[in-house]
Amino acid sequence: MAKKLAGTMKLQVPAGQANPSPPVGPALGQRGINIMEFCKAFNAKTQDMEPGAPCPTVITYYQDKSFTMEIKTPPAAYYLKKAAKVKSGASTPSRQTVGTVTVAQVREIAEAKMRDLNANDIEGAMKIVLGSARSMGIEVK
């Protein structure tokens, strides 16, 4: 017999750094999910990723208090900020540039994000990443 779905939730947790403190603990606890079990499973799955990289995670939880999780790749903005060596995007992106990235770096980011992007090929994924860069005030050369 199939498990009865109780709901889904989305969290953004740093890779390898899930712990029961807020915001993870309360978000899971109020839905009846075993917090320590989630933290151990999440940290085990993300141990090969860069520590501290924000990982969007979709958690599907069931009425029997079990859960499954899908860990996605870090946001394109995270990769772009890292490639451009900036702390944050521009406050006025159309008028201000905070850094530059090369087309090769954009391609590398698009390849890393490909499984989570809504694109058919690498060129489409690059356009999505270019749009993110433009909206952050990062120039592509």
UniProtKB/Swiss-Prot annotation:
InterPro entries: Ribosomal_uL11, Ribosomal_uL11_bac-typ, Ribosomal_uL11_C, Ribosomal_uL11_C_sf, Ribosomal_uL11_N, Ribosomal_uL11_N_sf. It comes from the Bacteria. GO terms for molecular function: large ribosomal subunit rRNA binding; structural constituent of ribosome. One or more lysine residues are methylated. Pfam families: Ribosomal_L11, Ribosomal_L11_N. GO terms for biological process: translation. GO terms for cellular component: cytosolic large ribosomal subunit. CDD domains: Ribosomal_L11 (cd00349). The keyword Ribosomal protein applies. Keywords: Methylation, Ribonucleoprotein, Ribosomal protein, RNA-binding, rRNA-binding. SUPFAM superfamilies: Ribosomal L11/L12e N-terminal domain, Ribosomal protein L11, C-terminal domain. Forms part of the ribosomal stalk which helps the ribosome interact with GTP-bound translation factors. Belongs to the universal ribosomal protein uL11 family. Part of the ribosomal stalk of the 50S ribosomal subunit. Interacts with L10 and the large rRNA to form the base of the stalk. L10 forms an elongated spine to which L12 dimers bind in a sequential fashion forming a multimeric L10(L12)X complex. This is Large ribosomal subunit protein uL11. It comes from Dinoroseobacter shibae (strain DSM 16493 / NCIMB 14021 / DFL 12). The lineage of its organism: Bacteria, Pseudomonadati, Pseudomonadota, Alphaproteobacteria, Rhodobacterales.
